[in-house]
């Protein structure tokens, strides 16, 4: 099995999608299934396949997959204005990081009252049999004084871990685990209700969830 046209994407990324195996009896159905799986990756504009007889033999063939790669990265930004001031944002997503088939994402959003940072990573083949694993991190700082609600701030951090396992060519089961932690700072002149709440409940809150 040969691959042509994948200048960025590594051969291993294509080979793990094969349902026709080298050294096995050739099957038109498995060859076509392999081609369709390459298309589903979303890394290629076009995927073609041909079978070529091996010179000097009458019972062997080479299978050649020709791919045309397409852009897998996206860069975006946003700019807005509300009653609370200017809002700006930036995001970067690469679905085929360094040709590994892994996905990496970064997002930053800032305004006068809030800053949010997100980072994500996803490996669709964490194990050889197609189990996937992903991570996501975030940090959010909010100044509620800018809302004219109350003069306090909060800092939140979170970690997410995602696992997936294929149960068919088109279906997967998954498990998402998340941990969130929020710290509240009442400031130098806190509102009495907020101060009473923090004295009773504390100023740090953590949650763990699974779904």
Regions found by a protein language model. Give the residues of each.
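Gram-negative/organellar outer-membrane beta-barrel architecture
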Residues: 8, 24-211
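N-terminal periplasmic "start-of-domain" segments of outer-membrane beta-barrel proteins
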Residues: 8-22
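Generic structural signal for individual residues within well-ordered alpha-helical segments
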Residues: 2, 15, 32-35
């Amino acid at each position: 099995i040969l691959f042509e046209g994948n200048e960025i994407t590594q051969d291993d990324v294509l080979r793990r999608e094969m349902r026709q195996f080298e050294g096995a009896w050739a099957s038109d159905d498995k060859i076509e299934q392999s081609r369709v799986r390459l298309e589903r990756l979303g890394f290629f504009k076009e995927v073609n396949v041909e079978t070529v007889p091996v010179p000097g033999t009458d019972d062997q063939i080479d299978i050649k997959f020709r791919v045309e790669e397409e852009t897998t990265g996206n860069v975006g930004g946003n700019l807005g204005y509300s009653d609370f001031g200017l809002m700006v944002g930036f995001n970067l997503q690469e679905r085929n990081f360094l040709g590994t088939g892994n996905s990496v994402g970064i997002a930053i959003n800032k305004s006068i009252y809030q800053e949010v940072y997100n980072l994500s990573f996803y490996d669709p083949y964490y194990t050889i049999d197609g189990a996937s694993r992903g991570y996501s991190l975030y940090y959010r700082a909010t100044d509620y004084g800018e809302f004219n609600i109350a003069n306090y701030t909060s800092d939140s951090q979170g970690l997410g871990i995602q696992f997936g396992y294929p149960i068919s060519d088109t279906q997967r089961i998954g498990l998402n685990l998340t941990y969130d932690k929020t710290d509240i700072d009442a400031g130098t002149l806190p509102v009495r209700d907020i101060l009473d709440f923090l004295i009773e409940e504390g100023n740090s809150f953590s949650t763990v969830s699974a779904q």
